[in-house]
Design a protein with these regions (language model features):
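Phosphate/pyrophosphate-binding active-site segments
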Residues: 136, 174, 292-384, 509-513, ...
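Charged, low-complexity, helix-prone segments enriched in Lys/Glu/Asp/Gln
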Residues: 61, 80, 337-354, 420, ...
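Active-site diphosphate/adenylate-binding microenvironment
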Residues: 9-10, 14-19, 27, 32-37, ...
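Well-ordered beta-strand positions enriched in small/hydrophobic/aromatic, beta-favoring residues
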Residues: 69-71, 159, 378, 401, ...
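Thiamine diphosphate
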Residues: 99, 107-109, 113-114, 306-308, ...
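Active-site nucleophile and cofactor-binding loops and adjacent substrate-binding regions
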Residues: 24-26, 45-56, 71-78, 133-134, ...
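N-terminal alpha/beta PP-like core and its mobile active-site loop of ThDP/TPP-dependent enzymes
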Residues: 1-333, 367, 371-374, 429, ...
Length: 554
């Protein structure tokens, strides 16, 4: 059948199972938006306040579901406004397809109105990108973009579509989506060697990351831990893969991880790293990281093997396939001496002391867990509040904690929460944690949450400073607080009212308990401002370049 480019665009989106699209219209994408208008019953378009918010929403949608997030923006500034969101997804291996409009093909390279070379700009932050110069290539290019985003190590793909391509006509043939390509092969001898090392270990430890968030990987990982009594620690991106309360779960590792996890890495004799890249927030000193251990690394991306830390055995493959192949070769085991050592370290873990005269982050987060139960999805911005959420939430679901890890994007949270809420439905509870610094970055997305009546509860930790940077200035820069006290006078309760949502302000725990309970009853979005002390710290902390011997506990 004969279709124009805009019709092909919609048909392929539907063919690929896209039900929700985040974006912002503009001149170069008017033809696409006209077709989306005609097909509003097939694809829900979510209009955000800013293209960056749309990109983060597509990201949040993908993280909450595992499906590909889709974002659409016009040419020039519309496209460049996506860059931070695309880079955020790239660093955390999130499947996303970003569509951008462009000037007509005859005008490319002539510095026309709202022209930007977005293909070149995004080369370092995408798995692949395309510029479609012929309408005949549009359908298969879009299909390739979705396939690439989900295949192997997941990530964002950009498709740039000049305006004339959206109007041109060609023959279109519908196709079934191709199966997702994953790495099903692995070196069987390496897997046997890994199993032998694990079976011989006296102090084994599993260290896992975001590469095991899929349901297919979670269960074999848990089976490995319990079959051979192997304790485990995880990165920020993997919270919830092994549930809170599991006796094998030692807690988060790294700069703001717990004492036990960091000590266990230093003392283990075999470290099994699964779906993780030894980032500099975990392996703060690559030369001393797990220095007593034989290190096994399993990763779907061969380029990550041994990149940041020298490893003794590397296995290329999908974690689910490798772990399932390894499990029958693992002998049931107990490690009583090792577990006794770990229990002694757990007695030394940092536990904040509550102060009844003020509101403290661990109290707030604990109360959120009490009132929400195990099924809520939590989203964060970036800063101290992000680490407090990672430390104190009772993570139980592999996709229940959504945060920007690799890029550390302030302003990520509200857009991502909108995407997660749209993906999961209004009956699913989504709570977003932010700080007054991060929230100022993209709080304009409140109008999006209001427009779509999304019942997102936003908890704002307000210490009136840029807390994480200020903490570093306190510890390492002689308390010289350069530009971390912005002296802002924002009244978040009044601002909430201006956006058309309900706002609360709390200075103690009973006030927060009452406010959160009321927020749970609201049909639309709410903000709860929590006034906390500006000297509140994220502890423990290991300085950059340090190790367990440098940990700060007070």
């Amino acid at each position: 059948m004969q279709l124009n480019g805009s019709q092909i665009f919609v048909e392929v989106l539907c063919e690929q199972g896209v039900d929700t699209l985040f974006g912002y219209p503009g001149g170069a994408v008017l033809n696409l938006y006209d077709e989306l208008y005609k097909n509003a019953n097939r694809i829900t378009h979510v209009l955000t306040a800013h293209e960056q918010g749309a990109a983060h929403a597509a990201d949040g949608y993908a993280r909450a579901t595992g499906r590909t997030g889709v974002v659409l923006a016009t040419s020039g500034p519309g496209a460049t406004n996506l860059v931070t969101g695309i880079a955020t997804a790239y660093m955390d291996s999130v499947p996303m397809v970003a569509f951008t409009g462009n000037v007509p093909t005859s005008s490319i390279g002539k510095d026309g109105f709202q022209e930007a070379y977005i293909e070149g700009i995004t080369v370092p932050i995408t798995k692949h990108n395309f510029t479609v110069r012929r309408v005949e290539d549009l359908a298969d290019t879009m299909r390739a973009a979705f396939r690439i985003a989900q295949s192997g190590r997941k990530g964002p793909v950009l498709v740039d579509i000049p305006k004339d391509v959206t109007a041109a006509v060609c023959e279109f043939t519908p196709k079934q989506p191709e199966p997702i390509r994953t790495v099903t092969t692995y070196n069987e001898e390496q897997v046997r060697w890994a199993a032998d090392l694990i079976n011989a270990a006296q102090r084994p430890l599993v260290y896992f990351g975001g590469g095991v968030r899929s349901a297919a990987s979670c269960q074999p990982l848990r089976d490995l831990l319990h079959k051979a009594e192997i304790p485990a620690t995880y990165t920020l991106m993997a919270a919830g893969v092994v549930p809170y309360g599991d006796p094998m779960n030692l807690g988060m590792l790294g700069m703001h991880g717990c004492y036990t996890s960091n000590r266990a890495v230093a003392e283990c004799d075999v470290l099994i790293a699964v779906g993780t890249r030894f980032s500099d927030r975990v392996a703060l000193n690559p030369k001393t990281f797990a220095k007593n251990a034989t290190i096994i690394q399993i990763d779907i991306d061969a380029s990550e093997l041994g990149k940041n830390v020298d490893v003794d055995l590397s296995i290329v493959g999908d974690a689910a396939y490798v772990l399932n192949a390894m499990l029958p070769q693992i002998k049931p085991a107990k490690h009583p001496d090792w577990m006794t050592m770990i229990q002694s370290w757990q007695a030394q873990d940092y536990h904040p002391v509550s102060d009844p005269t003020r509101l403290m982050p661990h109290q707030v987060i604990g109360e959120v867990c009490n009132q929400c139960g195990p099924d809520a999805v939590y989203v964060t911005d970036v800063g101290q509040h992000q680490m407090w959420a990672a430390q104190y939430l009772r993570h139980t679901k592999s996709r229940g904690f959504i945060t920007s890890g690799g890029l550390g994007t302030m302003g990520f949270g509200y857009g991502a929460a909108i995407g997660a809420q749209m993906a999961l439905g209004r009956q699913q509870r989504v709570v977003m944690f932010t700080g007054d610094g991060s929230f100022h970055m993209n709080l304009n997305e409140a109008c999006t949450a209001v427009s779509y009546e999304l019942p997102i509860i936003t908890v704002i930790f307000n210490n009136s400073v840029l807390g994480m940077v200020r903490q570093w200035q306190t510890s390492f820069y002689g308390k010289r607080y350069s530009q971390t006290d912005p002296h802002r006078k924002t009244d978040f309760v009044k601002l909430a009212d201006g956006f058309g949502l309900k706002g609360y302000r709390c200075t103690n725990l009973p006030e927060f308990q009452e406010a959160f309970a009321d927020a749970l009853q609201q049909k639309g979005p709410t903000w709860i401002e929590c006034i906390i002390d500006k000297d509140e710290k994220v502890l423990p902390m290991i300085p950059g370049g340090g190790d367990i011997n440098d940990i700060i506990m007070e």
